[in-house]
Amino acid sequence: GGSSDSRHAPKETAVGMSNPGYTIEAEIRPEYRHFKGALAAARQGDEVNPEKRSSGEQFYLVQGKTYTDQELDQIEKRKWLAAKNQLGDRLFKPLQEEFQRYKKTGQYQKADSLLRYVNEEIEKQYAENPYKMSPETREMYKSVGGTPFLDGDYTVFGEIVEGMDVLEKIALVATDSNDRPKEDVIILGTKLKRK
């Protein structure tokens, strides 16, 4: 929601491509999760937005679903592998030229030693800060639901405290081939409450 090109856009038109000319620095905090009812900032994908900067105008409300322990285990595993790969890329990048030089000059033991160092550093750093959901977080995803696979990748900045039935109604609205509601859903007002 929130894209300025969605206002008065003809039906069956793809929206969400407008650009207000700015993005917002990511504020991803581990205590804010994508539980059902969370309000979060949309953003472009990692390949064009590695800093995970948020859209200056678009947001989304989390509907999601409830999860089993097995499904949550799989999500943890995928996030763990993605985090290790990112860490590996970050650690290897400054050593890449040295590694290539060793390989080109036939110094394979030195090249292997460099790779061993990077792999050991990945394991060490990841062991200090693994991706693991707390028992409370797992329980919320099992009972309330949401989208746990988005945790750690998008800025969550609020939650629905009253009117969860409105989220349910929005989720049931028929959408077109662009995943846009066939009939516009207009937010007439909001109230912000500080915790």
Question: What are the functions of these language-model segments?
Answer:
Residues G1-K195:
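Cyclophilin-like peptidyl-prolyl cis-trans isomerases
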